[in-house]
Amino acid sequence: MSKRVILFLLTNLAITFVLGIVLNIIFQVTGIKGTSTTGILMMSLLFGFTGSLISLFMSKSMALRSVGAEVIQQPRNQAEQWLFNTVQRQSQKAGIPMPDIAIYHSADVNAFATGATKNNSLVAVSTGLLDNMTEDEAEAVVAHEIAHIANGDMVTMTLLQGVLNTFVIFLSRMISTAVSGSRDENGNSTQNTLVFWVVDIALQMIFGILATMIAMWFSRYREYRADMGSAQLVGKEKMIAALERLRHVHEPQEMQGSLSAFMINGIRSKELFMSHPPLEKRIEALRNL
């Protein structure tokens, strides 16, 4: 699984999980039993989108801290000047404001783009990529990241994740309310608080896994689109060459806690949880353009 979407998803899931617990506490303290479907849905929307929006607006600063990168204010050497010129040229061609640029020290052959909006975005590449790829290949990788920004992928992912969060919280609460509810000897509705909490938290974890599968499927779809965007900016042969290069380099190590927003490369795992399609499929899709 790639370093790019993982941090966003983990941050989002953590925030949503904590907010879900806070929601439980609010209901218990206020005495709300969760019987109002409309009320639960509104609260689920509020808490579901809060998690994804916080993740979105934190994405750029978190990405920079995670890799220890600093934004290039003024190119200091040939590599930085080349990257600056390449990003500037491609962003103009794609019709977006020029993103911030960063180079981070890592042996991984990788790059990522992140940021809350097209006006506040970041493109970062590793020293491993600059050391191991030709200029044509590196140019294609940068174009791939520019395509992610131009396509508005981070915002789209945020909206999708907000919807998924909402359903996770809503379904968990509705089911846990039904399972934990009963009637006393007088026919009054009662609720087993312990059962409610246990079932609600367990269901949020289960539904959260299913939501992650959906998010990963959408991420794979976006990778194909970004590859096509790169092909439009620099030509498909350069993008194919970049992907072929990735097949001959070591698989990148996972970062502590993962990272970021739009990595060009990804570590293979079971397909349902892969944020990127297999390189072979991406190359085949480009050749069929």
UniProtKB/Swiss-Prot annotation:
Active site (catalytic residues): E145
Listed EC numbers: 3.4.24.-
Gene assigned in the entry: htpX
UniProtKB keywords: Cell inner membrane, Cell membrane, Hydrolase, Membrane, Metal-binding, Metalloprotease, Protease, Transmembrane, Transmembrane helix, Zinc
Origin organism lineage: Bacteria, Pseudomonadati, Pseudomonadota, Gammaproteobacteria, Pasteurellales
Cofactor field: Zn(2+)
Pfam family of the protein (one): Peptidase_M48
Gene Ontology molecular-function annotations: metalloendopeptidase activity; zinc ion binding
Cofactor binding note of this UniProt entry: Binds 1 zinc ion per subunit.
CDD domains: M48B_HtpX_like (cd07335)
GO biological process, one term: proteolysis
Bilayer disposition of the protein: Multi-pass membrane protein
TM spans (from-to): 6-26, 38-58, 152-172, 194-214
Major subcellular location class: membrane
GO annotation, cellular component aspect: plasma membrane
Protein name per Swiss-Prot or TrEMBL: Protease HtpX
Subcellular location: Cell inner membrane
List of residues binding Zn(2+): H144, H148, E223
Class of enzymatic activity (EC top level): hydrolase
Family according to the record: Belongs to the peptidase M48B family.
Cross-referenced InterPro entries: HtpX_protease, Pept_M48_protease_HtpX, Peptidase_M48
